[in-house]
Amino acid sequence: MKYIRDILELELKEEVNKLQRCSGGNINDVLECQTNNFHVALKINEAEKFPKMFDKEAEGLKLLSSTPFRIPKILKQGTFQKWSYLILEFINDKGSSYSDKKLGENLAKMHSITSNHFGLESDNYIGSIPQQNSLKKSWLSFYIEMRLQPLVKICFDQNRLNKGDIRLFEKLYLELDKIIPKEAPALLHGDLWQGNIISDEYSEPTLIDPAVYYGHREMDLSMLLLFGSISEQTIETYNDIFPLEKKWKERTDIHQLYPLLVHLTLFGESYLKPIQGIVGKYT
C-alpha cells in the first residue's frame, strides 16, 4: 500500500489519515482516502493493462457533467511508476434512496442532449473491454458495426459463439431496421445498471463509471431493465419530458444483446442462452 500513499501524498500534498478499500472495483482498485482537507476516491490500475482507461473515464465524466445528474468531480489524474490513477471527490453512497421521479427527469434531460452523429470522437471502454465509437450517420450502422460485430468476433475467437451463432447474427442484422425506430442520437451513460447510479448525501441520483457515446436512448433503459428494474414513476416522469416510442419495452431485448455479449466475453457461458434466445426470436 506504500505506493498508494505515495501517490496520494504527492498529489494532495497532505498526509493520509484514512485509507480503505471500497466495495466493487472488479477492474480497478478503488480506495477511500481522507486527509485533513480532502476526502477522495482513488481509482488505480496497471497502466499497461488498460491504456488510457482513466483518460477515457475522465472524458466521459466531463461530458456527463453537462447533464442534471451529479457527477464526481475530477481532482487529479496521472501515472506513478507502473500505475495509472484517477482521484475523484468522494461521494458517500446512500444506496438507492434517490427519488424515482428525479431519476426519470434527469434521464430524459440527459437523453435530450444530442449530436450530429452516433458514436463519439474517441474510443473508450465498457468495463475492461475497449469500446469502438467511430461516428456513423445511422443508429443501425453504428449498432451493428461498432457494438454487435466486434463483440460477436471476440466471443467467436474465445470459442463462446460458434459458426451457427454467427450465421444467425448475420440474419438478425437484416431484420433490425424493421424493429428499431429511428431516433436522433442521444447522450448515453453507456453502462447504466443500478450499481452505476448511486445516491449522494442529498438523495440526488449520481452517475459513476461511464462508457459514454451518442446512441439510441433505448440502450440505457434496456440495460437498466436487464440488470434490475425501472419504476413506473421513473418511466412516467421520463415520458412527460421526452416521450418514448410505442412498444419500447417489447424490443428492449434487442438492445440488451450488447451488454449480454460484453458479459459473455468477460464472464463466460452463463450468458450464452439469453443471447441465443434473443437472436432466435427475431430470425
Regions found by a protein language model. Give the residues of each.
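Short helix/strand-capping connector loops at secondary-structure junctions
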Residues: 254-262
